[in-house]
Amino acid sequence: MKRKLVIGSVVAVVLALGAARAVRSQSTQDPLDPLKIAPDTHKLALENAFVRVLDVHVPPGRTEPRHRHPHGLSVYFTDWDVRVTREGAQPEVRQRKAGTFQWSEAIVHTIENVGKTEGHVLRIELKF
């Protein structure tokens, strides 16, 4: 199972890099950058001209303050339950499953781990 997750993660990164046509500059001044908002749970794993990859670990009961992600791909490594509150929307509880992937457009949101297991996500943010 872990081997499949690692292979899937590598494939996701390769696809993201292969799709790059233009480079969008990353705003290092963004006050909603999750690396600034929640540095204890969001770690920079890789950054180049095309992508920024965040290794995210959200413990049970933890609420992540309002933050922003550009469009990109999330790779889930653990099963966990998360309450997602998108800007201007009602909160939704979602189940994340290990080994699954999810594309999302740019988002501003707050998340809360409402389950009993740590959420582990690799967030691949595209810079184009």
Region locations from a protein language model:
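Bacterial N-terminal signal peptides that target proteins for export
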Residues: 1-9
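Hydrophobic helical h-region of N-terminal Sec-dependent signal peptides
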Residues: 10-15
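Bacterial Sec-dependent signal peptides at the C-terminal "C-region" and cleavage site
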Residues: 16-31
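Mature N-terminal segment immediately following signal peptide/propeptide cleavage
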Residues: 38-67
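Histidine-centered metal-chelating micro-motifs
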Residues: 61-64, 100-112
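Glycine- and acidic-residue-biased ligand/ion/polar-headgroup-sensing regions
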Residues: 69-88
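Ligand-binding loop in jelly-roll beta-barrel domains
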Residues: 79, 106-128
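Short acidic-glycine-tyrosine-enriched beta hairpin
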Residues: 88-106
